[in-house]
């Protein structure tokens, strides 16, 4: 395997589809943080059709290798460069608290609702982002070839577990104040 799975494009795309079918359940919402399919438009349409067979809702956060997905808006629930999603503990009982996630293909130094304890999920940098994730910021590389994902699709439960460990018993506000990563005047 190379940085993004098998060495050739066809092998990569087959690997993604096989993993998808082994992991994703009917009606799941899947957030793809870019570089989804690296094939031509015809192959992309075929592969997206195979992925959508399970009735999943695919949200694409555009990456630098997503040219073949341009103008395929009917294949996605949403297409964004940055997507912010609120997950409620009342809906997902495994969440330690309500969780806001700001997703982008690229790591961000500042992201929406960071002062309130939101998480930045990103990909793009492959396995080369430990210097970003090891700090106090609430950002996490969830790219398939990241150490966190370990060549598997990451679930909300895994992200919630990481968040709980990072907070270490604190509320998001307490964590932000204690970590001193935000000037206190910006915390609401």
Regions found by a protein language model. Name each.
Residues 1-87:
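Core catalytic region of metal-dependent phosphoesterases/phosphodiesterases
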Residues 15, 21, 182-188:
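Non-catalytic interaction surface on structured domains
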Residues 74-186:
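Conserved beta-sheet core of the metallophosphoesterase superfamily
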């Amino acid at each position: 395997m190379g940085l993004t799975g098998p060495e050739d494009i066809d092998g990569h795309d087959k690997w993604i589809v096989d993993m998808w079918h082994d992991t994703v359940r009917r009606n799941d919402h899947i957030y793809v943080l870019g570089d989804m399919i690296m094939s031509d438009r015809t192959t992309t349409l075929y592969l997206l059709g195979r992925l959508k067979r399970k009735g999943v809702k695919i949200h694409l956060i555009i990456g630098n290798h997503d040219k073949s997905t341009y103008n395929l808006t009917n294949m996605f629930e949403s297409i964004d460069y940055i997507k912010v999603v609120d997950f409620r503990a009342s809906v997902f009982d495994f969440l330690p608290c309500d969780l806001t996630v700001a997703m982008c293909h690229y790591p961000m130094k500042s992201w929406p609702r960071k002062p309130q304890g939101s998480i930045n999920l990103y990909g793009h940098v492959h396995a080369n982002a430990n210097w970003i994730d090891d700090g106090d910021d609430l950002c996490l590389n969830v790219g398939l070839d990241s150490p966190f994902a370990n060549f598997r699709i990451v679930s909300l439960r895994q992200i919630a577990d990481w968040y709980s460990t990072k907070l270490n018993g604190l509320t998001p506000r307490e964590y932000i104040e204690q970590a001193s990563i935000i000037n206190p005047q910006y915390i609401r």
